[in-house]
Amino acid sequence: PLLDGLARLTQSPGIDRLELVLLENGGADGFGAVVERARELQLRTWSVTIADQLGVAREAGLVPGDVSRSKAIAASRTLTHRFVHAVATSEGCNVVWILDDDVRVPQDTERWVSNVTRLRNAQLDVVIGSISGSPPVPAASIVRTQLVDVLAFLQAARTKGADDPVQANGSCNARWTDGRRDYYYDLSRQDTDRLETPFIPPLRATTTGAAVKELVSQLDRIFAGEAVTRPIAPAEGDVVTDAAPSRLRGGNTLVFDLELLREVPNLAPRLRGRPVRRSDMIWAANAALRLGRRVVSAPFDVCQDRSADMAERDPARRLIDDILGYAFFRAYEHVLEARGVSNTPLASGQREHVLHLARKYANERFAAYRVSFWRARGLATALRRCVEGSWLSSLAGQTASEQMQSFLAALDARFASHVFGDQERAFDGALGEGGFAAHLDE
């Protein structure tokens, strides 16, 4: 779907030329099929194979082990930046759009072109676009809130008949999201009043029986990171007048100052033998607070579609990498902001302050996860009690009942008591490795 959207974009009269750089990250057969599809769509395509990536790995600050078929974000972005810069400069491109492969190009391509033109004319260096649909966070950090929604919905459904109408979700959910940013996020620091506020799942069905059937059929997608019950609404506002300084970069970024792709490394601290997550944010902080570039966020929206993603095989690993990466970014950004724009090395006291804050923030966020884990375990127990008896199969059919039991079994496995103990030991071990200090010393 992303390639189809890019092909649509090339038909816009405002697009002179589009160069597509594809980074191999996955099975060789799958990558070959993607490249072939891009060329079928007549997209000017530059394919970057694993061999190509290995050729520049050390020069880019990576080790050969980073260049695998399942790369960490820091490695993927570092390589993407390098090859995109080479193509953009050789082909005379004046803007780079860096996207994750699961986002979708907006249908209104004329408005997209107009917005990019306006952002470029505003003399911005980097624009961090917004994401709607499923959030760009580990699946394990959006389970608890969705279980709250599922439990409330099923508790209400069991009191109704199969043909009873379903409550509309639009106005109710709009109240809960108004003025909130992280209403979908189990580890939210600010919008904690939405953690236990049930949202009404956005379902197509209009009767209770059909709605329950539809919802239950989607529950396993929560483990793949889909926002089944709390999708992110598209950001509202004007891309220029509502732009604001930010370093919270994700999978939708416009870069107008192309030299930043070579000058600023997109690396992250290495813990447990691999880079942690949030390297994009560290990159944005360096661009803004070391080099003084204009880095902003704007309601330049794309939808993230995780419907083709598989359930995460090791959700705790990705979650811990995210907690540690965010903690380091937040600490690093805080110290850089406090000292003012400067590209000089951190003083000894500043370096120690980063390390102190990073450990503090990591422990705070893991504490939030601890609460979330045990709350999810309790919600799983409540869900099991809610669906006892035959009401679910009577209301939505035997298949729905079987799907629900499968989902409950998966919850029991993911939120077993011993699982959290293993996760806590992994977190403590990674935090004690000294990778934060090593990164600052590079």
Predicted regions span which residues?
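Acidic donor-binding loop at a coil-to-helix junction in glycosyltransferase catalytic cores
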Residues: 276-282
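Terminal low-complexity segments of carbohydrate-biosynthetic enzymes
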Residues: 260, 301-442
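Acidic/polar loop patches that form or flank catalytic/metal-binding clefts of enzymes
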Residues: 294-300
